[in-house]
Amino acid sequence: MSNDISVLIYSCDSYSDVWNPFFTLFFRYWNCPYQVYITTESKECEWENVITLNTTGEKWTDRIRKAVEKIPTKYVIGMCEDMFFRRPVRQEIIDYCYWEMEKNPEIVNFNFEKTLTPTEDCVYDNFSRRVCRCDYQCSCQPTLWRKDKLLELLSGSQDPWEWEMTEVSPDDYYYVWTGNEDELVFEYGYHQKWFGIQKGKWVLDDVRPLFAKEEIQVDFMKRGCV
């Protein structure tokens, strides 16, 4: 299984100051069994066991597509670099989703965020199927993707907000977490419209107590605060 899945962190040069707190918490709360990649334009991430994929493009999807093309595995867990873990990742749920995707090729992804959009009941524990043509069938939040389908969905030239509104085929299946909020697979402090960073600035009410608890030093003034 570990040879079938990779993790791709969506990032950019201007967020390189976020990498230290992100990866500190990432590896503290996840004994990740997969190869981890980060995509950015030109900088090199120096974290041990993290491979940097430098890509350029006119739009966000152009860069991410080029990065995904370089990843050799059948599945990719994608997420952004401003999602700071607060408790252990539930690896057993990721394993469960992997095996269901192996058995059912029509499944495009399992999205691990708490859904705010319409869903339909399904047979998978703690998940529901996203209603056809609803928003966020493509999501930048933690998601286990079938790589070939992810590449198809990245074929346009879009920014991340446009991409999350992409209209997808009604023949494909997209699932999202509808279990208890206190049992999320990845807990990163999501509050509907923001988490650790909002519009490029630190959300102090969120990250200051978190980083103090985790003994992570950050100069909040460099990025600014809200």
Q: Which residues fall in each region the model found?
A:
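A structural signal for short, well-ordered beta-strand segments and their strand-loop junctions
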Residues: 37-38, 76-78, 108-113, 144, ...
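Catalytic core and acceptor-binding pocket of nucleotide-sugar-dependent glycosyltransferases
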Residues: 137-202
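Hydrophobic helical membrane-anchoring modules
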Residues: 193-226
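N-terminal anchoring/stem segment of glycosyltransferases
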Residues: 1-75
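Short beta-strand-to-loop acidic/aromatic patch adjacent to the donor-nucleotide binding site
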Residues: 74-84
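Short, flexible, basic/aromatic active-site loop/helix in glycosyltransferases
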Residues: 122-135
